[in-house]
Amino acid sequence: MAAAVGVRGRYELPPCSGPGWLLSLSALLSVAARGAFATTHWVVTEDGKIQQQVDSPMNLKHPHDLVILMRQEATVNYLKELEKQLVAQKIHIEENEDRDTGLEQRHNKEDPDCIKAKVPLGDLDLYDGTYITLESKDISPEDYIDTESPVPPDPEQPDCTKILELPYSIHAFQHLRGVQERVNLSAPLLPKEDPIFTYLSKRLGRSIDDIGHLIHEGLQKNTSSWVLYNMASFYWRIKNEPYQVVECAMRALHFSSRHNKDIALVNLANVLHRAHFSADAAVVVHAALDDSDFFTSYYTLGNIYAMLGEYNHSVLCYDHALQARPGFEQAIKRKHAVLCQQKLEQKLEAQHRSLQRTLNELKEYQKQHDHYLRQQEILEKHKLIQEEQILRNIIHETQMAKEAQLGNHQICRLVNQQHSLHCQWDQPVRYHRGDIFENVDYVQFGEDSSTSSMMSVNFDVQSNQSDINDSVKSSPVAHSILWIWGRDSDAYRDKQHILWPKRADCTESYPRVPVGGELPTYFLPPENKGLRIHELSSDDYSTEEEAQTPDCSITDFRKSHTLSYLVKELEVRMDLKAKMPDDHARKILLSRINNYTIPEEEIGSFLFHAINKPNAPIWLILNEAGLYWRAVGNSTFAIACLQRALNLAPLQYQDVPLVNLANLLIHYGLHLDATKLLLQALAINSSEPLTFLSLGNAYLALKNISGALEAFRQALKLTTKCPECENSLKLIRCMQFYPFLYNITSSVCSGTVVEESNGSDEMENSDETKMSEEILALVDEFQQAWPLEGFGGALEMKGRRLDLQGIRVLKKGPQDGVARSSCYGDCRSEDDEATEWITFQVKRVKKPKGDHKKTPGKKVETGQIENGHRYQANLEITGPKVASPGPQGKKRDYQRLGWPSPDECLKLRWVELTAIVSTWLAVSSKNIDITEHIDFATPIQQPAMEPLCNGNLPTSMHTLDHLHGVSNRASLHYTGESQLTEVLQNLGKDQYPQQSLEQIGTRIAKVLEKNQTSWVLSSMAALYWRVKGQGKKAIDCLRQALHYAPHQMKDVPLISLANILHNAKLWNDAVIVATMAVEIAPHFAVNHFTLGNVYVAMEEFEKALVWYESTLKLQPEFVPAKNRIQTIQCHLMLKKGRRSP
C-alpha cells in the first residue's frame, strides 16, 4: 500500500474534528496556493521510498483551486468504485458464459436415441422414394397392355397431356402451389438404389422404353383408364420428369375410384416432396390416408414431417408405420434420428438463450464502461498534460541535484540575504558563476565561524553584471540552447515567443501542419561559402539599351556525368511548364540587391550583361539567374540556368545550385524529386541549415513527419549563420514542443513518427505509454542548460520508468562556451583534474512487475529515400556518443545497415516463421465486381451444392502441368487454409450480409455449372476448396482459371496455386508460380509478400528479406512484412551467431 505524503493526492488522513480539521485545511490551502513547478503528488512505497507520481490525477493544471482538487478526489474515488463494479460484472459474465463449443458432438455420442440411430438425421435421405403397387389392389398390369406386341425402333412415350386435355378437376389438387407450378418443378437425381427403377421392368420383363411404348398404345385405345395413367406416372418417375408425373397422376386421380386414389396420391406426393414442396406433399399423403391404412403412406408422411421439422408428427407417423410392419429397420432408424435431432435442437435453443442473455449483460457492461470512460475524461480535463508533468519533474530533479551536490552531496543554505552560504561539513563546495550563488561573499562550514573567502577560477573580470542578473531572473529554460545559427541565446532575449512559443501562439499561428503550397522556399547564397559577385554598376552597360533577360543557353555546357542523372528528367516534365511566380524567391531577389523599388526588367538586364561579360565565376551568375527566373515563374529557364550552374560549379560548391534547384521543385509540388537533390547536397556539404530546412519542408509535404522533424532538429544543431532560417523557427519549435497539437505521435518501438488522421479508427491503443520524442529533446536541452551539474532520479509513468543520470565533468575549458567554475573550501586541484562531465543520459526501463505487451505495428510513414534512415528519430539518448571502431576483417556493423541491435532483438516479439501465412489476391484488385458474376440476392431453395471444376481439362501451355505439384495433385499432402473462411464469407459484403460457407459454395456452384469458362468463377471455386482443404479440387479449378484467364489476370489464380504448393511443402514449384505472379503484376504487394513467405519456408532468409523489403516499398504500412523483416534480422544475428547478413 502506498501512503500519500506532501500535498496529498488521495487525502488519506484519519478522521478528525475541531481544531485539527481546521489546521489541516489551512495547511492544505497554504500549500495549494503556492503554484510551484514541482510535483504535487507523492507516495511512500512499500519499501519506504518517497516517490513522486508523475502521471497522477492530482497533478492539476490549477493546483491552487481547492474546489477542483476536492472534486478531483471525489471523481477518483467514484472511478475506483465503478472499476470494482465493472470487474465484478465482467467476472460474473465470464463465469456464466456458455462456452460449450462441443455440445453437438457430445450429444451425438451420449444420447441414447443418437446411439440407436447411428447417424445424424441430416445424413439420412429423407427423400426416400416410396410407391404403392397395382398388385396391392389385385390389379395385374398385363391385363392393360399387350406385352407380346412388337415395339418399333423409335418407341413412343406416354405423354398424358397429348392423350387427354384434362379440364379442371376437384380431385386433382390443382389448388396446391406445387401442382400449379408443375412446369418449374426441380428434379434432383434419383439414387440408383431407388426401388422405383425395378418395379415395372421386373414385373413385365421388358425395358423401360418398351414399357413406355406399350403404355402409350394402351392409352391410345383407352383414354380413361386410371390404371394406365398410374403406370404412366411410374414410367415418368423412373425417367425423373416431375412435370409428366404430375400430369399423369392428376388424370389417374380424376378417373380412379375413391379406394384406388392412394396409388396416384403417393406418386404425386413423392414428386412434390423431392421438388421441395414438402408441405403440399403432406396434404396429398393425408388424403391418401383417408382412403387406405397402408404402411407406405405413414412411412412417406414420416419422412415429409421430418424434413419440415415437425418432429412430433414425424415420430407418430413412424410409430404407425411400425405398427403396420413391425421391425422395419428404416422406420426404426429414422424415428430415433428424429428424436436425437429434436433433443439437440432443444439444447441448442437453450444455449442460444444463454448466449443472448450473456450478450445483453455485455451490452449493459459496455454502457457502464462507456460511462467510466466519460468520467475518466472529466478527470483528465483538469489534470496536467503528461509532457508538462515530465517537464516540471525534470526541473525539480535538476534543482534537487543542485542543492545536493554543492559539496560532496551536502546541503548548503543561503543566508544573510543570499550573501553567505552555510554548509554542514568542511568539504569542498562548488558553485557556478551566473547561477543563484552569484552574490555569495563567503561560506560558513559547520557551526563554528570558520569561513573562506571566494576564490575565483578562470573568472571573467569583464563580465557584464547586469546581464548576469538578468539571466538569473529569467527562466533557465531560456538558456537551454546556447547557440542557434551563429547567435547565442541572448540574441533571442526579445524573441522568446519564437524560441519558446506557447501552445496558444502555436494554435493561432499554425493551427495545422502546413501543406506543400504554404511552406516557404529558400535560396542558398554563395556568400555562405565565402564567394561574392562583383556588384554591377551603370558603367557596365547603357541604361538606354532595350531591356534584356538573362539567357543561360549561350554559356558553354559541359555534361557532368556524376549528377546529370538527378536532373535529366526535369527538362521534359509537363508539370514544370506552367508559369508560377515564386513570391519568396522575389523577396530574396530584391533583398540581394538591397533595393525593393527596382523593376524586374532592370534586374534581368543586370544579369544579361553579367552573363555576357562575367566578372566572377560564371556558375555564380547562373545561380543568380536561376533565382531571377524562379521569381518570374519561368521554370524552363530557371532549370536551364541552375543545371548549367550545377555542371560548371566546383565539386565542393555543387550543393548551392542543388539546393536552389530543389526549392524550385518544391514550389512546383515535386517534393519527392526535391528530396533526392537535397540528399545529394547533404552528401556534399552537411553544414548548411538551409539545406536541412528545405529537406524538412519537402518531407512535410510528403507527410513524412518523422523525417521532417529530424531534418529540423539537425538544422537547429548547426552553428552556421543563417538569418534566412529564422522565419521558420517558430514552426519548428511548435512541432517540437506540441506534437499532439498536430496529431503527431511517436512510436516507442520503431522510432518513427506518424501523423494520424482525425477520427481514424485504425490506430489501436498501446498498452505502453508513448512518450513524445520532443520531451526527450527537452531533457537533452536541460543538460545544456546546466552543463556543469549532475543529478540522478527516476520518473514513473504508467508502467514506464524514465531514469535520469548526470555524470560530472570539470576539466572543460572556457573554449566550451560554458560558465566558469568557482570553489570554496578545501578544493584540491587533482580532484578537478580527475573529474569530468560527459553526456547526459536518458534511458527508459520497463518496470519488472508490469507485463506489458508490444503493440502491433500501425500505419507508419517511412522515408522514401534509401538513406532516409539518417533522419529517423532516435528515442534513446545513450551518451557519451563515442565513435565505434572501424570494421575488422569482413564483419560489418549491422546497426549501420539499419538492423536492430541484439538488445532490441531480445525485447522484440518474434514472428513464428514456420507458421504458414495464407494470402489471397481478390478479383476486385482487377476492377472486377464479384456481385456481377455471383448472385447473392436470390434466396437459396435447393439443397446445398459444391462447385466442381473439370478435372479432366486437357493439358495446355497455361495449366502448368509440367510442375510436379500440379501433375500429381491427387497425392498432395495439403492441410487446408481454414483461415481464409472469413474472406470467402465476406464476398459481396458491401452490398449483401455475410453468408455461411455452404451458402457461398452453393451460389458459386450454381453459376459455375452454367459457365465453366469463367476464370473468375473458377478462382472463387478454388478459394472454396482451399478453405475445405481439398487440394486436388482446388488445383482443378485453378488449372481451369489459368486456361481461360487473360495474361494480365493470371496472377490471381497463380497466387492461390503458390499458396497451395507452399502448404504442401513443394517450395520449388511455389517459387516458380509466385515469381510468375510477380512478373505479371509487380505493382501488387501481396505478390511480393507471397514470394517472401516461400523463401522463408526454404530458409533462404536473405532472399526473403529482399522480397519483404520490396513489399514495404509498395505498401509501407504493411505490418506483417515489417515484423517478418525484424524477426529474420534478429534470427540471422542471434540464432546463427552472425553480426551481418
From Swiss-Prot:
The keyword tRNA processing does not apply. Interacts with CATIP. One of its GO terms (cellular component) is cytoplasm. SUPFAM superfamilies: TPR-like. InterPro entries: TPR-like_helical_dom_sf (IPR011990), TPR_rpt (IPR019734), TTC17 (IPR052630). The lineage of its organism: Eukaryota, Metazoa, Chordata, Craniata, Vertebrata. Belongs to the TTC17 family. This is Tetratricopeptide repeat protein 17. It is found in: Cytoplasm; Cell membrane; Cytoplasm, Cytoskeleton. It comes from Homo sapiens (Human). Pfam families: TPR_8. Disulfide bonds: none annotated. Keywords: Cell membrane, Cilium biogenesis/degradation, Coiled coil, Cytoplasm, Cytoskeleton, Membrane, Repeat, TPR repeat. Plays a role in primary ciliogenesis by modulating actin polymerization. Gene3D superfamilies: Tetratricopeptide repeat domain (1.25.40.10). GO terms for biological process: actin filament polymerization; cilium organization. Expressed in germ cells as well as in somatic cells of the testis (at protein level). TPR repeats lie at residues 295-328, 619-652, 689-722, 1014-1048, 1051-1084, 1085-1118. Residues 340-382 form a coiled coil.
